[in-house]
Amino acid sequence: MESRDSKIYPGIRRLENDITRRRDAHGNRIAAAQSEQSVAAPYTRTVWVYVPAQYVKGTPAPLLVVQDGHGYLNLVLRVIDNLIAAGRVPVQVAVLIDSGGGDAQGSQRGLEYDTLSGRYSDFVESEVLLRIKQECDIVFTDDPEGRATMGASSGAACAFTLAWYHSERYRRVLCYSGTFVNQQSPPDPMTPRGAWEYHAHLIQEAARKPLRIWLEVGEKDLHHDDPEETWHNWPLANRRMANALKVKGYAYRFTLSLGARHVDPRVAEQTLPGALEWVWRGYLSTVEA
């Protein structure tokens, strides 16, 4: 997919200048206005579509949207294949989407994944899924209970954001090493600490949404020694997310992986089958009923 064809994300890249090189005392980037840290730039985005052999053409398919798709092709597709064959998850189509490139503040990936809004969900719905429907002749279910989303790092925060801002589209979320920290770019005065705001007050203050959420973080994940006031400690942020979800009465699971680091591949290899099975729990029985 070419950026020139997108009405929602025409493309940016981070500038390398004194502003974007700024760091706080703990080495974290400091966000700035988009005009100071980014410049318009084209990108090419790759999207993979996995259609299982069991899919019956023309029937509305349950959907799994995966952020940073290239990083999960082998693992996710192998796991889904095995789970479908065993009848442990619904027959589903997986859409694995690469970001528009770069990372963190000022980048296209940062704009897509770390922004707290419904913008990325609108992009997936109106530009990615619509094109797949047209070009691959696939019908996706409109039932939000039949739509899941997953990712790691900023892709995990993005997966949660997809469901949080559009729970009428997605109800099932799977997150590895979620970037629920102060990394939003450009800054937004409505959510000044970025995804840290989810566990600081957004989850507590909003009416409970019909979401099912699986969270994981490594014990030695990014900035695990940083103090809370940096709003940039991954293990702390994810523990706070789990507590906020618990207090509010959400269906959730939280895994703290001992000794593991950021997006530790050993953790995903060991936990993804059970995580996907738990995320989809209840959907098969509902459909069969």
Regions inferred by a protein language model and the residue ranges of each:
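Non-catalytic cap/lid and distal C-terminal segments of serine-dependent acyl enzymes
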Residues: M1-A289
